[in-house]
Amino acid sequence: MVDIKKGPPPDKIMNYLGSRMEVELKNHHKIVGILAFYHLQEQTIHLTDWMDVDEKGQITKSGSFIIINRTAWFQLYNM
């Protein structure tokens, strides 16, 4: 698992388009999905086929498309 926040700079996140990613939110929920788009200036992540996973790894929510604003996410990982 590559920690993109501490690894490649934000302008390299676009290299992961189409990859399965894990986003840890500031409330420590983890959302897993396919990176569809990343807005560099606003650091907004767009995921498709996403799942919200709790601490035990159980899926609590899921959907086809979600936009996560930078103020909500804490870490971004390539799975």
Region locations from a protein language model:
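Conserved RNA-binding domains used in RNP assembly and mRNA/RNA metabolism
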Residues: 1-79
